[in-house]
Structures are given as structure tokens and as C-alpha cells.
Amino acid sequence: MQNATLSSPIQISERAQVLDVLRGLALLGIFLNNIYAFSGYGFLEEVQQLKFATYQMDRIADYLQTTLVEGKFYSLFSLLFGIGFSIILRRGEQKGNNTTALFYRRLLVLFLIGAAHLFLLWEGDILLLYALLGALLPLFRNCTNRTLLIWAAALIISPVVIDLMKLWLEASPAQFLLPIGVAIDAENGITEQNWRSFLFTENSGWKEWRAWQESGWAIRFHYLLDSNRLPKVLGVFLLGFYAGRKRI
């Protein structure tokens, strides 16, 4: 009975409505960020885009998407993830329960959904990353608020140091992944010359999509590592954890 109570969804009366609104906004932003690729427009050469009567409006939309949307909403989503962790801990403490096991069970479900999404449907998945980095959050549960802020600041600023190290060493920890992705693509007939049109040839379908997605994990993790997304996301997780503790 105790486990059933602990695992039950948060009642509507317990939810902060503003968090639900922000979650919806974050999801909308992530959708808008990905619609450029989903539509196929991003795969077109500029000479092909020029043929559209809406080309000038498309350029404005592209600028607005890059300026206002791209890379912005994952930070909000990460912040809410950290706040969610603090809410799980608070509920457990109020009931006198240890919520770490519950948190890891939820992360396992998130991991499985994210893995299926990444390997089968869309290389732009973020759920797998959140599950992996979220597994580190319980390590910070006993930190003071000041320590949380120090860790968060250090992680968020760390990409500056990491990029300087890359320049100094002339190497990147992600560099081994790109050749793997290129090799997988080559086996599936995807080359530098045809990658833009591979999915849009006549009679293309699920088989071509699966061939395209086969290298997605390597390309995705190359991007995540090369863009220093991991420390930035974990740092924002911790900011969210701090905000949740303070009930900001």
C-alpha cells in the first residue's frame, strides 16, 4: 500500500499550474525547433528553396527560429526536470519515504522510451540524454544550496574551458563518433552527395528511413559531446533542483 501511494501520480491539487504551463511551452518550443527538419525544408539546397514563392518569408522564419527558438527551450526543459526531481524528493520526505528507488524506476522508463525513440524514430531525441544525466542527480541530494549553485555554475561555464582544451590539444572527445556514422551511412548507400535527397527519392519509405536512422545515434552523440551539451544540461538540472528546493 505504501509503494502504491508513493508511486501514484501527483494530484492536480498538488501541482503548481505555472510549472504545467512552462512544460507545455517547453514542449512547444522543442517541436518548433524540430519542425524545420520534420518538414524536409532543411534538406533542400538553397537553389531549390529559391523556387518557392514564400522564399523571402521562409528566410525571415528561419532567422526567427534560429534567434528565438534553436537551443533555447532545452534549457527550460532541463530546468523543469531539476524542479521535478526536487518535487519527488519533497513528496517522499513528507511521507517519510526514500524516493531514490522511485526516481530511478522512472528514469529507467524514460531511458527505454528514449532509446527506442533514438534508434528507431528520430536521431534528435533528448530523452535518453536526460535519463543518463538524471541518474547523477541523487548524488547531489545532500548538497547545501550553496554547493548546488557552485556545481551548477561550474558545469554551465565549463564548456569555455573544454573548448580551450580542444583547441590546445587539437582533438575532441567526440571525434571518434563521426567516422562511425559516416561508415554506417556508406554501407547504406548514403553519401555526401546524396544525403539531402536520400529520403525523398521516388518510392522511398520505411526502409530508407531505417537506413537513414541507423547512423543517427553516432551523429547525435557526436553533436552532444562536441557542443558540450552534457555539462550544460546537468548544470541546468542542478539550477532547477535548487529552484525547486527554494520553491522559487
Regions found by a protein language model. Give the residues of each.
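Long hydrophobic alpha-helical segments that form multi-pass transmembrane helix bundles
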Residues: 154-235
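Internal alpha-helical transmembrane segments
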Residues: 86-87, 91-166
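Active-site-adjacent bridging/hinge elements
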Residues: 53-59, 105-110, 210-214
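Specific transmembrane alpha-helix
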Residues: 75-90, 128-139, 228-248
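Hydrophobic residues within the alpha-helical transmembrane core of Major Facilitator Superfamily
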Residues: 31, 157, 237-240
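Transmembrane helix-loop junctions and nearby membrane-interface residues
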Residues: 34-41, 160, 164-171, 243
